[in-house]
Amino acid sequence: MPTSSSPAVASLGDGPQGDAKHVLAALREQTRDEHQAIEQTLGLMSETLTLQAYRRTLERFHGFWQPVEARLQQRVELREIGIDPVERAKAPLLARDLRVLDVGNPAVLPLCREVPLVASTAAALGCMYVLEGASLGGQIISRHLGARLGITRESGGLFFHGYGERTGEMWRAFGAAVSSFAVTTEARDEMVQAAIGTFRLLRRWCERDEPLSTA
């Protein structure tokens, strides 16, 4: 999310649009530090991960994904470049996982108030890079949850199961949309700033200490 204090970042490239792999690889490289920071905060791949810690992560994710996805769904122009935020919504999956894990009514859990503004198409795509990346990486996390906690798609792992067998297809479609829009340096750099901002806001929300539920 661009702000006056946002760090300078290298451009995703000059000249005409690159292919999807190039644009996504550049996004990944320029958000590497923020990505690693949130992974460290969550500890989902830890060999000492507990069910309580996993449930808390789902609560935090629900509180972030729901308001962010609501904003993304207002960017109607995303559908013109092949992205349907409603089809890609994950908040309903998080709500289902929480109910399965006996958290209670997810609708009463607090929502994050400091979320990305997504005030432009480029900012929306940068934000979605973080959310869609969670679905892509969720395939690895899903296997770890099964091995460590016995969590399956049906028993509280639907969010990280994500698109399942369609994960690769959905990621490629997202990459194609990003590439088709990233035709100027300004658009590409705005995507990077939005992705960095989204990672940071998510980490800040997940680092809060107060309990979200009594489960």
Predicted features and spans:
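Metal- and O2-centered redox machinery and metal/ROS homeostasis
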Residues: 1-215
